[in-house]
Design a protein with these regions (language model features):
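Transmembrane signal-anchor hairpin modules in multi-pass inner-membrane enzymes, especially those
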Residues: 1-82, 92-94, 107-123, 127, ...
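Interfacial juxtamembrane loops and adjacent helix segments
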Residues: 148-161, 275-279, 290-294, 302-342
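Flexible juxtamembrane loops connecting transmembrane helices in multi-pass membrane enzymes
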Residues: 227-228, 250-293, 327, 447-460
Length: 635
């Protein structure tokens, strides 16, 4: 094989296409995480090719390259699969996707270690990372400052935070920090020589810092200002002084840049730091801790977190034990808490052991190099303690695995062992990309069909019937299909079909607590004439989704039931507000009035609410009223 087309060179080329094009793929979707987001499916297509190249290298060289860190990670991954065998893992199938993603990450690290990537190859990879970050940073700034109403990507121009392709501002913030990390690595290895390279590095630092600030993520801000002191001691000893100064100056200018558009727009600021989320995170952690204490040894079962959380939260809220009520919680926004609640002590101790060993291994180097390596991983590690970046973004997970592989190799070196099996690695090198790409491309078709189905009134069932591979969105696919059958059965009075829906929803309600699940179940009971069961379900939904919270089942039920029900709700709502003012009740009333087209009344209620509750910022910034309160032509 010519030097131009070595496996290492092909690895760089595939990675380059991913960072320049693949990761930025856009397709309309209905939100979510993991494989529900189209760009993640495309990233996994490229990732499978990268894994395949690593396995092909094993076949060609007939050698295995590894170190102790890789063995520890492999052993830890096996341990994390074991709770699937627990007797309480009723919903374990819904944890398989994250276990497969974790295992794929180990395969990525393994594949990178097999390839004999030279310093030049690694520098190219870092520059490709800079390119990807630069593209996303500029795209995020375009979203925030240049896009107009009705843009084809569907970005809400009233939003105060940019999200890039990720549809989640905090994930954008963590991703763009990779630009600062990659540039720091480049200048530490004196790989920034030409003027063009300096322009790329400094330009990326400037725009990445700007995008990080406008992402409005407190986690990202903490990570940004914590990683600098971690990186600086090693950079001071290894980087050329003028490059280090330029690096720091560009980051500082990027952090200051968001103030410039505000100064040019007569001081009209766009507040990037959005609503109060600290109380929500504290609540999730507090509820998770209580759940862990109740089942510390075997946990509540993989895949069960969503169902058990909301009932526990409602019970604690009724007792006045928590502040900050949260909804649609499928993850506690803390990775350790997630595994501990679902799997108990084994996953918890495994993760702590893995983290402890890795920190121990890198601190066998000089303290400046160890702090530098820790700083390279710090933004992602911090983010996993406050949210779920690896679930929202496959590219963040991939880059994290890249960094782990390189750091582990620098800290411990690599051992080489003969591996005479030549055929098996070559077969898997072909099969893994083949099946992954087929799965992900049919997944993109699934996303398109389900998005079209839901956006066009959920009435054209042929869209669901035309889906080839429902697995990437299996829960949503099943819900849409069963809801369509429920609606048809209600109209045609098909009692057997209605009972079939209730039987199916029994398991769903224990696994996933959502307002739409309660609503459908109530409709099924009513259609069967089971008014007592319908009322019991309604009361349970009110318990899970109280009236004075952001998500109120009473309001949602009225909104879905029809105009008369909504008008009756507004009468009830006003009566409640006479006795005690409440921000959430006011917001529900205003949103209901907007839905009914009573805009002037909604504006009066907002003014009244702001006077009665002057410290409630949410009352001054209600999204449904923005089109009627902002000046013409503003964005």
């Amino acid at each position: 094989m010519s030097s131009k087309w070595t496996l290492e060179a092909c690895f760089s080329y595939v990675f380059a296409v991913l960072m320049f094009i693949g990761m930025h793929y856009f397709q309309h979707n209905q939100g979510g995480s993991g494989l529900e987001l189209p760009f993640n499916l495309v990233v996994w297509c490229f990732t499978s090719l990268l894994i395949g190249l690593g396995l092909l290298k094993v076949s060609h060289s007939q050698r295995l390259r590894y170190n102790r860190s890789l063995l520890v990670m492999l052993f830890s991954t096996i341990l994390l699969w074991l709770p699937l065998l627990y007797p309480n893992a009723e919903f374990g199938e819904f944890a398989i996707d994250r276990l497969l993603g974790l295992s794929a990450g180990i395969l990525i690290i393994f594949s990178i270690m097999q390839l004999e990537l030279s310093r030049q190859h690694w520098h190219h990879i870092l520059y490709f990372i800079l390119a990807g970050v630069l593209i996303e940073s500029i795209y995020a700034l375009v979203q925030l400052y240049l896009l107009t109403q009705g843009n084809w990507v569907g970005f809400n121009v009233n939003a105060t935070r940019a999200a890039g392709i990720f549809q989640q501002p905090n994930v954008l913030g963590t991703f763009v920090l990779f630009g600062l990390l990659a540039s720091a690595w480049l200048i530490s290895e004196k790989a920034v020589r030409s003027k063009l390279q300096q322009i790329i590095v400094f330009g990326c630092c400037f725009f990445a810092a700007w995008a990080a600030i406008v992402s409005g993520s407190r986690t990202v801000l903490i990570a940004l200002f914590a990683l600098l002191p971690l990186l600086f001691p090693y950079l001071k000893n290894s980087a050329e002084p003028h490059l280090l100064r330029g690096w720091l100056i560009c980051i500082a200018l990027g952090c200051l840049a968001p103030a410039l558009p505000e100064l040019l727009n007569d001081g009209v600021a766009r507040d990037a730091i959005g609503g109060e989320t600290t109380a929500y995170r504290v609540t999730m952690l507090k509820v998770s801790w209580e759940l862990f204490k109740q089942q510390p040894f075997m946990g509540w079962g993989y895949g069960a977190y969503d169902g058990i959380y909301h009932n526990a939260q409602a019970a604690f809220n009724a007792q006045g034990l928590i502040k900050g009520y949260h909804f649609n919680v499928a993850h506690p926004h803390n990775e350790i808490a997630y595994w501990a609640v679902e799997g108990g002590l084994l996953p918890l101790l495994t993760l702590l052991f893995l983290a402890g060993y890795f920190i121990y291994s890198i601190f066998k180097q000089t303290w400046t190099k160890a702090c530098f390596h820790l700083g390279l991983l710090f933004p992602c590690l911090l983010h996993t303690m406050t949210e779920l970046p690896f679930y929202h973004s496959a590219i963040v997970w991939l880059l994290f695995c890249f960094f782990v592989s390189k750091i582990a190799t620098e800290a411990e070196g690599l051992c080489t062992k003969p591996f005479p099996a030549k055929f098996a690695p070559k077969v898997f090198a072909g099969l893994i990309p083949l099946f992954t790409i087929l799965f992900m491309l049919t997944g993109l078709q699934t996303i398109h069909h389900i998005s079209t189905f839901e956006r066009t009134g959920s009435s054209d069932v042929s869209l669901l019937e035309g889906i080839i591979n429902p697995l990437p969105m299996l829960s949503r696919y099943e819900f849409d299909a069963m809801t369509f059958r429920l609606n048809a059965a209600s109209k045609l009075h098909l009692s057997d079909e209605l009972k079939n829906y209730l039987s199916w929803s029994d398991s769903l309600m224990r696994r996933k607590t959502r307002t739409e699940n309660y609503y459908n179940r109530i409709q099924a009971f009513k259609a069967l004439g089971l008014t007592k069961q319908a009322e019991q379900t309604y009361q349970q939904a009110l318990f899970i989704y109280p009236d004075t919270e952001r998500v109120s089942f009473r309001y949602i039920f009225a909104m879905r039931t029809g105009e008369k029900a909504l008008q009756a709700y507004l009468i009830w709502n006003k009566q409640q507000l006479k006795d005690k003012p409440d921000a959430a009740l006011y917001i529900h009333q205003i949103n209901g009035l907007v839905l009914l087209g009573r805009i002037d009344e909604a504006l009066r209620v907002q003014q009244q609410a702001s006077q009665r509750l002057p410290n409630e910022l949410k009352l001054r910034n209600i999204p449904s009223l923005k089109p009627y309160t902002e000046p013409m032509g503003s964005s």
